[in-house]
Amino acid sequence: MRRLILYADGAARGNPGPAGIGVVIEDERGRVLREVSQFIGRKTNNQAEYMALIQGLEAAAEVQADAILVRLDSELLVHQLKGEYKVKSPLLKPLKNRAQVLLARYKVVGIEHVERQYNRAADRLANRAIDTASADELAESTRDNQQQLSLWDQ
């Protein structure tokens, strides 16, 4: 049985704000098989966390394993994925549902909360995605934020 370990992290500068995701996929011996670093526009931190998980699960599917251990530093996501907390945000419900569909592909699934120090590689990738986003991407993210704020004034 082939097993994978998936570390995922999302970062947002502002909540919502410019956001990025980071993913590290390892085999059971700790060898890095894949890394993902992607700017995802203007999102909340929790949206970014779920999007990192989803992107990680999609990348992991390419490796074709029977078992996966997901390690996240977001207690909220861990509790929601385990069914211990309800998902109240309408922004997060479809993301959680998508993650569950992707997790169902595996015969064995583990979901663990880890301290930030054990998720540093994914965190670095998420922040690097924001840091290296083009000026156009960042401007678009800021413009979206300003448009939404102006809607509140009406």
What are these regions (language model features)?
Residues 1-5, 31-34, 39, 61-64, ...:
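Intrinsically disordered, low-complexity regions
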Residues 1-47, 51, 58-66:
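RNase H-like nuclease fold core
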Residues 11-15, 54-126:
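RNase H catalytic domain
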Residues 27-30, 45-49, 56, 90-94, ...:
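Short, surface-exposed linear patches
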